[in-house]
Each structure stands twice: as C-alpha cells, then as structure tokens.
C-alpha cells in the first residue's frame, strides 16, 4: 500500500476500505478521502 501520515505516525493507506483489515495488528487509524490510513504503533 501507499504510505500515509496519521497523528505523526507513518501508516499504510488502504483504498476503498472504511475500516482497517484485521490480522495486521493495526491499533490506530485515520480516515482519508476514499480510504483509511492504518498504523501499527
């Protein structure tokens, strides 16, 4: 995925998803236009 910024963390941008996929250990997310940024901090 594309890197993205979320509260100062670098995350992964998931296109067309409204919530982060499970099983990756994500515990922080930021909503973006047409997708979501998911961060494992």
Swiss-Prot record:
- Superkingdom is Eukaryota
| SUPFAM superfamilies, per database record | Defensin-like (SSF57392)
Q: Which UniProt keywords apply?
A: Acetylcholine receptor inhibiting toxin, Disulfide bond, Ion channel impairing toxin, Nematocyst, Neurotoxin, Postsynaptic neurotoxin, Proton-gated sodium channel impairing toxin, Secreted, Toxin
InterPro entries xrefs: BDS_K_chnl_tox, Myo_ane_neurotoxin_sf
Q: Name one GO molecular function term.
A: ion channel inhibitor activity
Cysteine pairings via disulfide bonds: 4-37, 6-30, 20-38
The yes or no answer to whether the keyword Disulfide bond is present is yes
Q: Does the record bear Ribosomal protein in its keywords? A: no
Q: Name one GO cellular component term.
A: extracellular region
Q: Where in the cell is it found?
A: Secreted; Nematocyst
Q: Which Gene3D superfamilies match?
A: Anthopleurin-A (2.20.20.10)
Family, according to the entry, reads as follows: Belongs to the sea anemone type 3 (BDS) potassium channel toxin family.
Function statement: Toxin with different activities on acid-sensing ion channels (ASIC) and nicotinic acetylcholine receptors. Is able to bind T.californica muscle-type nicotinic acetylcholine receptors (nAChR) (alpha-1-beta-1-delta-epsilon (CHRNA1-CHRNB1-CHRND-CHRNE)), and human alpha-7/CHRNA7 nicotinic acetylcholine receptors. Weakly and reversibly inhibits rat homomeric ASIC1 (isoform ASIC1a) (IC(50)=1.25 uM), while it potentiates rat homomeric ASIC3 (EC(50)=1.53 uM). Rat ASIC1a current inhibition is not complete, and reaches a maximum of 86% inhibition.
Quote the record's miscellaneous comment: A synonymy between H.magnifica and R.crispa is controversial. The primary structure of this peptide is identical to Hmg 1b-4 from Heteractis magnifica (AC P0DRI4).
Q: What is this protein called in UniProt?
A: Pi-stichotoxin-Hcr5d
Species this chain originates from: Radianthus crispa
């Amino acid at each position: 995925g594309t890197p993205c910024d979320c509260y100062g963390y670098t995350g992964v941008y998931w296109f067309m998803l409204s919530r982060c996929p499970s099983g990756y250990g994500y515990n922080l997310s930021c909503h973006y236009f047409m997708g979501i940024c998911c961060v494992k901090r």
